[in-house]
Each structure stands twice: as structure tokens, then as C-alpha cells.
């Protein structure tokens, strides 16, 4: 009788060991997955921050350019400096229907492709303040082609509203690239005004 009880105890011990191993695997596998993903997440966050910095650099450069043009009298307002091509990029509604070509309905990559249809790195439309402008310097003191900004003005009254040429929506798209592939992009939109003195 004694042997029978021991065999029963040995069998229950095996079940406990299997349950403990299963529990440890249930905790360990997700933990391994999580720790292997954190470098990817950190990389994605870094690209996003770099793209934001590029967009901010574009905004700063455009602000200085606009101030200079207003100060020296080259510009008396924003009329004639708005982005209007590709056709419809500045018009939110056409005959009461949402315009699919409106810049806010396009991704950053779609906007950049629409501005450079043949993909040669040169803008195919007028009235861009900057197009894929580099601004950073790498460790060897050379221009770093990975970081660029594209900046343009949109008439915030286009497609309706009271027309005036004293304000505009300044749009700055910062991009981070690896070769020709865009790793991340950030778009800033800031309403800028011109006050006649």
C-alpha cells in the first residue's frame, strides 16, 4: 500500500513541475518579445523626433526668409506666394464635395511626390519656399542628406472665406531618410500674419 501512495505522489509532482514550467514560459516569452521590441520602438521615436526637428528647422528658415522679404520690400503681403499647384492642393471643397487633392487629405509622402512628379529631387511646381532642403552637418563636416525640410504657404481662405493677403498657413514638412526611403516625417502648420506698419 505504501508504494502505491508514493507513485501517486510522484505523478502529482510531475504535474506541478509541468505547471510551473508552463507558467514561466507564459511569462518569459512575452517578456522576451517585449525586450526585443524596445530597440525598434526607441528607433522609431528617435526618427520621429529628428523629423520634428527638421520641420522646426524649416519653419525657422521660412520665418527668416519671409521677414527678410517683407523688410526689404520684395513682398508686400502673401499674394502671389501661395502654393496653388498641383491643382487643388489649396482648396478643401469643390462644389460642396471634399477635394481629395487638398493638402490636409494627403500624407506627407503624397505631398512630396506631388511636388516632384518625376522624382528627380527638384520641385516641379512654383512658389515653394524650400524643397527637400538639407540643413544638418554630419560628423565629417558635410551636409547630411538624411534630414530635409520642405516649406510652402497655403492661402487659408482658398475655396471660401474673405480673401486677404495678410495671413497664410505656413506648412513645413520635415523628413528623415535612409537613401531614398523615408523613415519618418512630421508636418507643422502655423498661421503667419503680415502686419503693415
Name what the model sees in each region.
Residues 3, 12-15, 29, 41-42, ...:
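Conserved functional hotspots that engage anionic ligands or polymers and/or phospholipid headgroups
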Residues 7-32:
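N-terminal single-pass transmembrane signal-anchor helix
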Residues 34-42:
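N-terminal membrane-insertion alpha helix
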Residues 1-7:
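N-terminal secretory signal peptides that target proteins for export/translocation
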Amino acid at each position: 500500500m505504501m508504494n502505491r501512495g508514493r507513485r501517486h505522489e510522484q505523478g502529482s509532482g510531475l504535474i506541478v513541475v509541468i505547471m510551473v514550467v508552463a507558467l514561466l514560459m507564459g511569462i518569459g516569452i512575452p517578456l522576451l518579445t517585449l525586450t526585443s521590441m524596445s530597440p525598434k520602438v526607441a528607433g522609431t521615436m528617435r526618427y520621429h523626433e529628428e523629423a520634428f526637428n527638421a520641420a522646426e528647422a524649416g519653419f525657422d528658415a521660412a520665418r527668416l526668409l519671409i521677414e527678410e522679404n517683407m523688410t526689404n520690400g520684395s513682398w508686400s503681403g502673401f499674394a502671389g506666394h501661395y502654393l496653388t499647384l498641383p491643382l487643388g492642393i489649396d482648396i478643401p471643397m469643390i462644389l460642396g464635395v471634399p477635394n481629395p487633392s487638398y493638402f490636409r487629405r494627403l500624407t506627407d509622402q503624397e505631398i512630396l511626390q506631388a511636388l516632384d512628379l518625376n522624382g528627380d529631387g527638384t520641385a516641379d511646381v512654383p512658389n515653394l519656399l524650400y524643397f527637400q532642403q538639407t540643413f544638418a552637418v554630419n560628423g565629417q563636416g558635410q551636409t547630411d542628406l538624411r534630414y530635409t525640410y520642405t516649406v510652402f504657404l497655403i492661402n487659408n481662405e482658398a475655396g471660401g472665406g474673405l480673401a486677404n493677403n495678410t495671413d497664410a498657413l505656413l506648412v513645413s514638412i520635415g523628413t528623415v531618410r535612409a537613401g531614398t526611403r523615408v523613415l519618418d516625417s512630421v508636418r507643422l502648420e502655423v498661421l503667419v500674419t503680415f502686419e503693415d506698419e
